[in-house]
Regions:
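N-terminal beta1-alpha1 ligand-phosphate binding loop
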Residues: 2-39, 45-49
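Short, charge-patterned binding micro-sites
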Residues: 43-70
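Short beta-strand-to-loop capping motifs
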Residues: 12-14, 66-70, 107-110
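A common structural junction motif
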Residues: 34-38, 84-89
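Flexible, gly/pro- and Lys/Arg-enriched active-site loops
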Residues: 53-60, 75-78, 85-190
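A generic structural signal for short beta-strands and their flanking turns/coil linkers
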Residues: 8, 40-43, 60-64, 99-103
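Long, highly charged amphipathic alpha-helices
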Residues: 29-33, 76-83
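Short, charged, low-hydrophobicity "junction" segments
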Residues: 18, 83-84
């Protein structure tokens, strides 16, 4: 690790192309934009195709995870991710809607933001409430990592021993706890 840089994990997803770009191309271009923004890429997962949520509601997603380093605060990284999403015409029409690009800061070292209590509130929020509510502040680690096969499987490619700072489980352990049916719905892309 470069002096003063922080280890971070970013999830990438896309299920709507642009005029000249398919979702997989958007993910590849977004990775280039991450590098241009001062985020140093260390490793990239394979690309995975996953159903949209709820299944059948929208085109399938292309998902990936990058392990990176940066000498920025969590909030500065989030601003950079938002600018990259804007470059790819990201629209925030509704929660969990189709999108050209979704960049999520999954973790920044062992940081818990804004607090363990706030994280726990969002982590424990019932699905019916998750559909309606959106956090107004940055949450780290991302409160849904443990629930999402489209995050955990790519995460296994780049950092299988990543330890969740609150749940105290590795990425491998979190993946193993997922229902088998959800694991069947994800495909490695060629």
């Amino acid at each position: 690790m470069t002096k003063n840089n922080h280890q971070l994990l970013i999830a990438l997803g896309s299920n709507i192309g642009l005029a000249t770009s398919r979702p997989v191309d958007i993910i590849k271009d977004a990775i280039i934009e991450l590098s241009k923004s001062g985020i140093i890429l260390k490793s990239l997962s394979r690309f995975y195709e996953t159903p949209a949520y709820p299944q059948g509601s929208d085109p399938n997603f292309v998902n990936s995870v990058v392990k990176a380093e940066a000498n920025y605060s969590a909030h500065a990284i989030l601003q950079k991710l938002d600018k990259i999403e804007e470059k790819f015409e990201r629209q925030r029409n509704s929660r969990w809607s189709a999108r050209t690009l979704d960049l999520d800061l999954l973790a920044l070292e062992e940081q818990v933001l804004p607090s363990k209590e706030v994280f726990q509130y969002w982590c424990d929020l019932p699905l019916s409430e998750q559909k309606k509510k959106t956090p107004s502040e940055l949450l780290l680690p991302h409160p849904r990592i443990q629930d999402r096969v489209f995050v955990l499987l790519p995460l296994l490619d780049v950092e299988p021993n990543w330890l969740h700072p609150i749940l105290n489980k590795t990425a491998v352990q979190l993946y193993q706890k997922l229902p088998e049916q959800t694991k069947k719905n994800i495909q490695t892309m060629q």
